[in-house]
A protein has these predicted regions:
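Electropositive, beta-rich accessory/interaction domains or terminal extensions
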Residues: 1-180
Length: 180
């Protein structure tokens, strides 16, 4: 059986909405370009961009805990560095994530949007060459970057076992495929 890629997604800001991609060029040992490049850290999160280390998603705003984030759509333009945050098609914020002022605007937006659901001042974090991956580096691995794959047959099997539909996007994979 042939394998067919049915969808490709990246998540430029960890915990926020997916961006559908038509195609992507992958490099060995790398994740999708700009996938999980940024994260929005909670006030208590310690992160050193000069010496980045893996941190659990609980250190950042995320859909699993901060359900209100599902109301928003985000788009990141890698060339300009601009993140656009929208709700039902209306732009709420457009800010350059590659500049301190833009990062402050994004952090302030989410602090106001989420209100008391988050603790401490939020901040945008980034470290060149680092991806805020969902899993830490495996023993003996040569990289901590990965591309997450899901066979749609696995989703169908899960739906059959549960007796209910499952939204494949809940798994936040990069590549969905049929076959194999």
């Amino acid at each position: 059986m042939a394998t067919t890629v049915t969808a490709i997604y990246r998540y430029p800001v960890k915990g926020l909405s997916a961006e559908k991609m038509d195609r992507v060029a992958l490099m060995p040992g790398e994740c999708l370009p700009h996938d999980r490049r940024f994260a929005i850290a909670l006030g208590s999160t310690l992160f050193d961009p000069q010496r980045p280390e893996w941190l659990s998603k609980t250190h950042f705003i995320m859909l699993m805990r901060d359900e209100k984030l599902a109301q928003l759509q985000t788009r990141f333009n890698a060339e300009s560095g601009v993140l656009v945050i929208s709700e039902t098609g209306r732009v709420l914020l457009s800010a350059r994530m590659t500049e301190l002022e833009g990062c402050r605007l994004v952090a302030d937006f989410f602090a106001n949007f989420l209100g008391t659901a988050v603790s401490g001042p939020l901040r945008v974090v980034e470290a060149p060459g680092h991806a805020f991956a969902d899993a830490r580096r495996k023993p003996n691995a040569t990289t901590d970057k990965y591309v997450s794959l899901i066979n749609r047959a696995s989703i169908a099997a899960l739906e059959a076992a549960m007796g209910a539909p499952v939204d494949p996007m809940r798994f936040r994979a990069n590549v969905y495929f049929d076959g194999a």
